[in-house]
Amino acid sequence: MASSVEDQQLQQEEAESVKDVQSHYLRCPSPSFSMMSDRFSTVSDRFSVISGSEAESIFMEPIHLSSTIAAKKIISEELPPRPARVSSPPDSALEPAQQLMVEDLYSRVQELLDERSLYNTPCVLDIQRALLRDRLEAPLSPVDEVWPNVFIAEKSVAVNKGRLKRLGITHVLNAAHGTGVYTGPLFYSGMNIHYMGIEVDDFPDADISPHFRSCAEFLDDALLTHRGKVLVDSMMGVSRSAVLVAAYLMIFQNMSIMEALLEIRKKRAISPNEGFIKQLRQLNETLMEERDEDDDETLSQCSVIDARGRLEEQESVFGVKADSIMVEEEEDGGGSVISSVASSAAAAALRAGVQCGSQQPNMQQPADQPSLPGQTREDEDGDVDRMILEWQKRNEKYQSEDWWEAQLLCEDEDDGEDKTQRAVRPDDLESVTSEDVRMVKERIGRRPRRAASLAGSTSSCSSYVDLWKQRLQELEEQAAARHRLQDQDTSSETQQKKIDDDVQSILSDSSSMYNFCKKNKENLTPLERWKIKRIQFGWNKKENAENGEQSEAEPAAAPDLEDVNLTAYQTWKLKQQKKHGGEENKEEILQMSRGEDTATARRRQRREEVLERSRRNLQESQSVCGWETESALSSSIPLSAFCAGAFPSASVCGDDSMSVLSGRSSVLSGRSTRSLPPAVLETPAPPTPVLGPNGEQMVNIANIQNWIASVVNETLQQKQTEMLMGASVAPSRAGSVFSAGRGVDDDKSSVLSGLSASTGLSRSRAESVVSVGAKARSVLSAAGRAESVFSAGGASQLSCGSRKSKITTTSVPLYSLFQDQVNLHKLDTMEKEIKSDMRDKMASYEIKKITEDNKRSTLYKKKKPKEDDEDVDIAKSNGLEELEARTCEKPKPKRDYGRSGILNLPASANNPTSSIDEWLEHVRPPSSKPRVYDGDSGPIRMSRPAYEELQEPSGLDFTSRRSSVSVEVDEEEDYSFRFSSRNCADDDLDPELSYSSRRSPSFNGLSESTSFASRRSYSRYEDEERSSFQNHSIKQKSSVYEDSGRTAGSRRDEEEDEEISAFIAQIKQRARARVAEEMEDDEVLTAWRKQEESKSHDHK
């Protein structure tokens, strides 16, 4: 509908315009005539499809035929032609976007893979793969020297003037001038730097090729003329700057595109975009073509120059000299290159030889031989012009297929001729390109043999000929190989030959091993791969050589000392020997350079370790007997006399550390000052050291152990009398007796070595000699106390059991002879048990200390209700009786076999006065008075005491604690005095030492609860206590001196039970408070989790 309406509108407009023209040009505006003109206009429209020639003839008719026709002609000239409407194709006929993208991608890949090139230039994709071969896409340094005095850098280096001065840059080439790096000549003013900038964007469609020549000339001028250093910079220094440097290398260093880019890639990671690489490929093609043209022109000019030089030589020298031409051969690779002058002269000599008819054996001179200097110049000029014309036709000769066939045929004829006579070969046209030379070759090729006199003059063979010959040989070999492969059967024979060829390639070139294994990865068995590996590394040759040497059984000649590889120390040692006049011993040098295998080295190292451990154990035994200081007290022979040569003495520090670690130091470390001189015992013979193959000492460990056991056995028998005398000494005096007169030997006498401990054991109880409980601490500690490791019970057992037992073989207690067999697990168990025991004791003492502190506090005395006098008297009497009962009934410590069984040793419980008990008796408990705080310091925070960690407060053994501590009245008074005097000094203690807790007040000896009333009462008394604290302490001192021992003891016992019950109740209340608080925390957590879950559900 729309199109029809438009047509109607156009027709109406056209009719109006026709009427206007008619009224303007025609003289008869009558209505009838106008109607008639309308009819004729429609007729003319109907016949307007007539061809151009016919329409022209119609319109060229005279005007009198019809005025309407004339009007139509005028209208067609005045009005523009109607434009033809082109119907737009529907959307369904258009290509979809996906298809267009695929086609675009395909075209891009085609451009990247385009390898069309006359000079085998690689495609863009291959170049990009070569540049990104090692997966390093970004440079590691902001600036790198990619070519001598040529640096590629990023923007940060280009704008750093100080760094440019340090680098010594004299020229700057900015590849991003105005497009990222905004520098210029004004920026580098005053630095004596020449600047050049090009404005190129780093886009694939950017054209950087117009700047290749100018930038390369700038670089060449900077390097050659100014002898300077050039910085080529861009934004990142990977694309634009790298392309410009590559263009310089291609233009002025005659490199190909791959050589230039890889040369830069060696020093810096570069990544030019695709468009720049395409432009570099085009530059590479252009340069290759120019070089070929230059080579052709150079060859043509050289040929002309050589010809003129030859004619001048003929003018000055007789033409006979042409037969004796001096040929300069330069060996380069495998072919010889002959100079063009000699080749031209050889061509003239050949032409002369052909004309003279050299087939005759007498070699007569021809008539038309080149004339002497008297010859006319016209012939010579004509020859030169003819040679020039022939040289200029060589390109047509290259393009001729007949010429290539002639070359191949000539090669075949060369192969068929006799090897003694050298055949004619096509010479290189770069050196000899004249028509005469070709004619000579053709004529000589038709003859059966050449003349011997001309063999030297035609012996030139160029590099191209050698290349052709090599290529033909390769083609023949390939053809022969294909022929053999076709004839051969596809059976095991073919596979075996293939393997043989591969093995041959492996033997010739080890680098082909990877390709061979890659091709035959699935076909080879592990044994075959192992054999090939042996071939690759040359093990088979070594074995064959060794077998050959063994079969010949001839003494090998001594190698040259210069070929011997020595270490730096060995070389220095030889130089020192020569310097001081020593002679060079060849056998010693070879022995030093001969590397020993790992097994021998391990055996030698093991022997050295065994020897060292043996020496240390012997030194321990020696230190037990004390040969250094008390050799006069005993007449036995020292151990060092047995093995003076084999076992050198070790240091005292080594003895001490070794014996402490091994845990086998003898319990006989204490030496008695009252020992009697025993009878001389028969000394066991020491083990004889066995010499190894290299002169080293071979040690038999079993013999050494037995020998040590026998020596120790005899020594212990000698010392038994001394120990019997030491057993009668009181336990409290044993340490001083055994360590009397020993100030220097404390380290030797305090070490643990159970090597000789088993000698004093009875057969029924062979595991109890040394105490480990509380006394082991004095031996292991570094306090330097010279306490004895023997208890009274242990000494008596030793004296009783030594008469019955005798060591015959090496005993096997917990720790064996050497250090590496120590059972560390048992040592850790023993240490943990000792620590736990000490922890329990300290916890009980802490509770006791707190009770003692609280019963003397002022606050407790004020809160304590007054009792009746009768009750006080009863309590005093009861307390006195209990105190006397406790002092009289001091139970002896029980023997604890739990810890002693770990070391198979007796417990040290027989000594009633242990060092721990003595130390704990004098422990001064710190004051439990709370820290005085100011009013504005906030609420008082008390820390939880350490005894809150106890899970079972009712399980505390307070009765055993009271029974184990024996405190007399005097000691109690002294203790209370010391404690009261410490109260004053404890006022300024650190608040961290006070017991602070948010939920529980300090323990004050009462039956406390966690109620608010107790806290309020505590705070009320605190202010009063602050004001009169010092007075209370002074009064307490005087009251302690006035009270009798009975009153103090009875009152303490009575109050102690109440305090313990209050303490237990307090612990239970705190535990319940903690549990309640944890429950509240759990409820808060659960509520929070439910809220979070509801929020997450709402979000979902």
UniProtKB/Swiss-Prot annotation:
Residue span, Tyrosine-protein phosphatase domain: 141-289
Record keywords, A-Z: Cytoplasm
UniProt biased composition (Low complexity): 667-676
Subcellular location: Cytoplasm, Myofibril, Sarcomere
GO MF annotations, alphabetized: MAP kinase phosphatase activity; protein tyrosine/serine/threonine phosphatase activity
Compositionally biased spans, kind Basic and acidic residues: 418-428, 580-615, 888-898, 1089-1100
GO biological process: one example: negative regulation of MAPK cascade
Cited InterPro entries: Atypical_DUSP_subfamA, Dual-sp_phosphatase_cat-dom, Prot-tyrosine_phosphatase-like, Tyr_Pase_dom, TYR_PHOSPHATASE_DUAL_dom
Domain of life of the native organism: Eukaryota
Chief location of this protein within or outside the cell: cytoplasm
Alphabetized PROSITE patterns for the sequence: TYR_PHOSPHATASE_2 (PS50056), TYR_PHOSPHATASE_DUAL (PS50054)
SMART domains linked to this entry: DSPc
Phenotype reported upon loss of the gene: At 2 dpf, morphants are morphologically normal but show pericardial edema and tail curvature. They exhibit near complete paralysis at embryonic and larval stages, producing extremely low levels of spontaneous coiling movements and a greatly diminished touch response. They show a severe disorganization of the contractile apparatus in muscle fibers. Sarcomeric structures in mutants are almost entirely absent and only rare triads are observed.
Tissue specificity remark: Expressed in muscle fibers in a regular striated pattern (at protein level).
UniProt biased composition (Polar residues): 1-12, 356-374, 907-916, 994-1013, 1029-1041
Region named Disordered: 1-21, 356-383, 411-436, 479-504, 542-561, 575-615, 667-686, 888-1060, 1075-1100
Gene Ontology CC terms, in alphabetical order: cytoplasm; sarcomere
Family, per entry: Belongs to the protein-tyrosine phosphatase family. Non-receptor class dual specificity subfamily.
Role summary: Required for myofiber maturation.
Protein name: Serine/threonine/tyrosine-interacting-like protein 2
Species this protein is from: Danio rerio
Gene responsible for this protein: styxl2
